[in-house]
């Protein structure tokens, strides 16, 4: 494999806050083997001049749904697109992510009927396409009428469409049924298991404070996944739901933006991994074109208003937890 000697005008290592200047880097194949100011260029290395640029480690998008393109697909999850089109969307989005500096994307549940997301991941891993590498949970596990059941948007206005919208999502009830779903995700190549354990903001039929799976169902999912050595990631917002999930053995919490300081300390002390996703609940910056963002439903807006004070309070708790840097993915 080729060897490169890269001269970086500005260099940020992702560990220290300072940005260094005039740093050299030696890359052998896919591995950075040395970084420093006074490195000599190996004879067999190709010189790459990035003196006009700032060089950073690859970014990680830790919470993404990449099977869509465009802001108008959210409420329907682009249900009219075939699985083949969604697979192509994922490959396209992986390349766009890489061009923007993201080398790894964690896909936390998709709207595929099948497992095209795994095909996209493998095609990129094999070098058929250039793009960010994927870490994938193909289908998030949820309950009827819960956070992952977006068919409820249409159940009273278009029942046939609503019934069809249930098909891409891993929605069921009962411990044995959830065991089956976990085993199926693993069979087709899941890197981790995602649970929609509680309600959310975007879903129309629930509340972020609702716990949606009972303990038997949660234990069935967690124990089945751990038997196969797959980590379990849970969508949850409130302290009660997060503390129960930690007690039952989940490996990571997504969101958590309604939790108390006590719960944040529990996450830190138990070394639970945590992805806050603060951006999705914050107002856009002034220079952002809001027409490019997915529209928020009336239900979403009502919930934001209901939890406005708690979101602001918990945001400071979350930021303090993120600053500690010990458990953040």
Label the model's feature ranges.
Residues 9, 25, 30, 52, ...:
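Divalent metal-coordination and catalytic microenvironments
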Residues 38-56, 80-81:
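Active-site metal-binding motif and surrounding structural segment of the metallo-beta-lactamase
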Residues 75-88, 158-180, 231-233:
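Active-site mouth loops of central-metabolism enzymes
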């Amino acid at each position: 494999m080729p060897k490169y000697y890269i001269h970086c005008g500005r260099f940020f290592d992702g560990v220290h806050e300072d940005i260094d200047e005039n740093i050299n880097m030696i890359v052998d194949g896919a591995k950075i083997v040395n970084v420093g100011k006074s490195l000599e260029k190996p004879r067999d290395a190709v010189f790459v001049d990035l003196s006009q640029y700032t060089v950073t480690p690859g970014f990680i998008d830790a919470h993404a749904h990449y099977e869509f393109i465009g802001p108008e697909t959210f409420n329907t999850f682009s249900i009219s697109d075939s699985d083949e089109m969604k697979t192509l969307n994922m490959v396209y989005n992986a390349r766009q992510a890489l061009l923007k500096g993201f080398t790894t994307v964690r896909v936390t549940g998709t709207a595929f009927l099948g497992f095209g997301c795994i095909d996209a991941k493998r095609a990129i891993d094999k070098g058929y396409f250039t793009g960010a590498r994927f870490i994938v949970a193909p289908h998030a596990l949820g309950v009827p009428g819960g956070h992952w059941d977006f068919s409820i948007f249409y159940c009273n206005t278009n029942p046939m469409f609503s019934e069809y919208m249930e098909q891409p999502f891993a929605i069921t009830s009962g411990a044995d049924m959830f065991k089956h779903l976990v085993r199926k995700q693993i069979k087709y190549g899941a890197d981790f298991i995602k649970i929609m354990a509680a309600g959310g903001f975007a879903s129309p039929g629930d509340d972020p404070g609702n716990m949606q799976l009972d303990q038997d169902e949660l234990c069935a999912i967690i124990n089945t996944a751990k038997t196969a050595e797959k980590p379990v990631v849970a969508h949850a917002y409130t302290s009660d739901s997060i503390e129960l999930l930690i007690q039952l053995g989940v490996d990571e919490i997504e969101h958590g933006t309604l939790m108390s300081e006590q719960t944040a300390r529990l996450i830190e002390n138990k070394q639970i991994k945590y992805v806050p996703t603060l951006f999705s609940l914050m107002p856009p910056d002034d220079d952002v074109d809001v027409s490019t963002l997915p529209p928020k439903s009336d239900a979403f807006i009502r919930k934001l208003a209901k939890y406005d004070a708690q979101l602001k309070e918990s945001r400071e708790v979350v930021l303090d937890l993120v600053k500690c840097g010990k458990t953040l993915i």
